[in-house]
């Protein structure tokens, strides 16, 4: 069976790390993120992918000590792999950014470019990103992939 690779957007990691979500409105986002990530971690044929762009977003939103702890977790976990963008990704992201009249951040365009080149499934809750990304790649919310 082929390996399935999921590129998890920073918003999903932030849901988990910051315990985001309102339990009075159903299952909190952090719990859905935790369940999704655990499903991948305990699978035989799935992995999580991240990039420096995800790390930059996390660094901006997390306290320094928490960020360092999470980076260490990423590096030590065998089911979580790091990928680097190349010139092709930057070019495609610039093209996407222009097509969208700069309504989507360059980092989000880079997420799409990486997923396209590496055939990754983008996992996010960002509705604007989902709307545009689905024209180019497979994109899902974590709750849609939990049975």
Task: Show which residues each predicted segment covers.
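Short, well-structured N-terminal submotif of metal-dependent ribonuclease cores
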Residues: 1-49, 62-69
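Acidic, PIN/NYN-like endoribonuclease modules and their adjacent C-terminal/linker elements
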Residues: 1-5, 25, 40, 82, ...
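Alpha-helix capping/helix-boundary segments
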Residues: 12-13, 54, 89, 111, ...
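Residue-level signal for well-ordered alpha-helical positions
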Residues: 19-20, 61, 96, 135-136
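Active-site neighborhoods of divalent-metal-dependent phosphate/nucleic-acid chemistry enzymes
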Residues: 80-125
């Amino acid at each position: 069976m082929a390996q399935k690779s999921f590129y998890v957007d920073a918003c999903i990691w932030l849901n988990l790390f910051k315990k985001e979500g309102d339990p009075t409105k159903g299952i909190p986002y952090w719990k859905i993120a935790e369940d999704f990530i655990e499903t991948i971690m305990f699978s035989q044929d799935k992995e999580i992918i991240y990039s420096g762009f995800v790390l930059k977003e996390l660094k901006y939103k997390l306290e320094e000590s928490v960020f360092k702890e999470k980076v260490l977790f990423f590096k030590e976990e065998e089911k979580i792999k790091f990928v680097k963008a190349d010139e092709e990704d930057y070019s495609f992201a610039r093209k996407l950014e222009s097509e969208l009249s700069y309504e989507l951040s360059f980092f989000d365009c880079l997420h799409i470019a990486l997923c396209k080149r590496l055939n990754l499934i983008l996992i996010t809750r960002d509705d604007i990103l989902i709307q545009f990304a689905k024209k180019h790649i497979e994109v899902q919310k974590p709750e849609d992939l939990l049975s």
